[in-house]
């Protein structure tokens, strides 16, 4: 009885690992396809607006408040 219970638990754990890894791999594959697809490469120029190298007075005030 203990052996059957142990085999059942191990089987359940392995099935859970398989289902989670399949979901993670499909999520990663969709992300890779969206990055390297035709539309994905043209949309990367939109990210340039997020990285502004200038520090404004408001940024300095926020940093002072944090410290």
Curated annotation (Swiss-Prot):
Modification Phenylalanine amide, positions: 36
Gene Ontology BP annotations: defense response to bacterium; regulation of defense response to virus
Chief place of localization: secreted
Organism ancestry: Eukaryota, Metazoa, Ecdysozoa, Arthropoda, Chelicerata
Tissue specificity comment: Expressed by the venom gland.
GO CC annotation, single: extracellular region
Record's keyword annotation contains Secreted: yes
Compartment list: Secreted; Target cell membrane
Propeptide stretches in the record: 40-67
Protein role: Amphipathic peptide with antibacterial activities. Shows antiviral activities against the herpes simplex virus type-1. It potently inhibits the initial infection by provoking the rupture of viral envelop and the dissociation of proteins from the virions (EC(50) is 0.41 uM). It also effectively inhibits viral attachment (EC(50) is 5.73 uM), viral entry (EC(50) is 4.32 uM) and viral proliferation after infection (EC(50) is 8.41 uM). Morever, it enters mammalian tested cells (Vero) and reduces the intracellular infectivity.
Record has Signal as a keyword: yes
Keywords (A to Z) from UniProt: Amidation, Antibiotic, Antimicrobial, Antiviral protein, Cleavage on pair of basic residues, Membrane, Secreted, Signal, Target cell membrane, Target membrane
Signal peptide: 1-23
The protein's name: Peptide Hp1239
Organism: Heterometrus petersii (Asian forest scorpion)
Family, similarity comment: Belongs to the non-disulfide-bridged peptide (NDBP) superfamily. Short antimicrobial peptide (group 4) family.
Tree of life domain: Eukaryota
């Amino acid at each position: 009885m203990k052996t059957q219970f142990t085999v059942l638990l191990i089987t359940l754990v392995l099935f859970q690992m398989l289902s989670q890894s399949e979901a993670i791999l499909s999520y990663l594959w969709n992300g890779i396809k969206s990055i390297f697809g035709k539309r994905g490469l043209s949309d990367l120029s939109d990210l340039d607006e997020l990285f502004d190298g200038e520090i404004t007075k408001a940024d300095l005030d926020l940093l002072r408040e944090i410290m």
